[in-house]
Amino acid sequence: MAEEPTYTTEQVDELIHAGLGTVDFFLSRPIDAQSSLGKGSIPPGVTAVLTSAAEAKSKPVAAGPVKPRRKKVISNTTPYTIADNIPPEKLPINTPIPNPLLPLARPHGKMTDIDIVTGNITEGSYKGVELAKLGKQTLLTRFTSNEPVSSAGSAQDPNFKRGGELIEKEQEATIGENGVLHGSEIRSKSSSGVIPGVPQSRPQLASSPAHADPAPASAENVKEIIELLKGLDLRLQTVEGKVDKILATSATIINLKNEMTSLKASVATVEGMITTIKIMDPSTPTNVPVEEIRKSLHNVPVVIAGPTSGGFTAEGSDMISMDELARPTLSSTKRITRKPESKKDLTGIKLTLMQLANDCISRPDTKTEFVTKIQAATTESQLNEIKRSIIRSAI
């Protein structure tokens, strides 16, 4: 972007006065009506042959050298129209108003000199009335992009202009504010016409200022990172759920292990109790009668080691005992007499047997019979006999 020049107030005033003076100088010159050709008086063809037509009717040509006429080369680019009476509030919204005191990118004028007598064509720079008018308009007016209605052309041929065929020249567009564009000389493509022209600049549309900020991070990268984090979070939640299930299963396994240990201990206790019951009361097999068991009984020698408890005494000569000097001697006793047993409290044993009869005997009449016997028993041996009978009946 071209650097914007700065001017002081005094410099701006001087430029304005100089431009106005130049414009007034050229506008105040008299115009000779017979020295120019009218539009209707120019027939189709080469302009050089018209010197004998309309120019011949004008004032006589001086004998001195003829001053070359200048020909305008007009571009068909769309010029800006002057908007002196459009207030700012009636402009479109967000339309910036350029500063009329800033220099605009205007090309230098072009000129083509045609010698009417000799027909020679010369080119050079032209900085005349048109540039003065443009300077005044630049300093005092603002521009809009409305296209003016041109009356210089013909209705049948829009490309026809005074001075010959139009010449188009692409101008380089500027960026941002108006920049300076240097003009270039263009050779006329037509030898017709006597009116000098200046190429018009291309229209410069009003542009809105744009703020330039640093480019943010790529939205695609941010989206990928967020999706990756969401995926990791989902996988982490899945792993946590599986770990919780594993911990719950392990706790159940530990509880089962403890219960199995308790069951093993209980089974061992029951087995011990059953073994104790068998040792204390082996009873009699149900398939062997008592008479057969009694027949199998016969007398056998019995050896008692150690001192006797005094529960019984041996009588008769069929027993051998040891005296004080540990000598075996025949005993004079012939039979064994048992001493009377001491009386004991049998209430607890009776209650135990009653509970055993209620649990093991299912028939009511048998149960009542055993309960009557338990209540009538007076010795411990009778209660033991009743207990054996209850166990046999239960088996």
From Swiss-Prot:
Broad class of the protein's primary localization: host cell
Disulphide bonds in the chain: none
Keywords, in A-Z order: Host cytoplasm, Phosphoprotein, Viral RNA replication
Keyword Phosphoprotein attributed: yes
Superkingdom assignment: Viruses
Chain residue ranges for the region called Nuclear localization signal (NLS): 65-72
Keyword Phosphoprotein set for record: yes
Localization per record: Host cytoplasm
GO CC list: host cell cytoplasm
Region (Disordered): 178-217
Low complexity compositional bias, start-end: 206-217
Chain segments carrying region Nuclear export signal (NES): 225-234
Pfam families for the chain: Paramyx_P_V_C, Soyouz_module
Subunit relationships: Interacts with host ARHGAP26; this interaction promotes host RHOA activation. Interacts with host KPNA1 and KPNA6.
Task of the protein: Essential component of the RNA polymerase and the nascent chain assembly complex. Also required during RNA synthesis. Also plays a role in viral growth by promoting host RHOA activation and thus actin formation via ARHGAP26 inhibition.
Family: Belongs to the rubulavirus/avulavirus P protein family.
Protein name per UniProt: Phosphoprotein
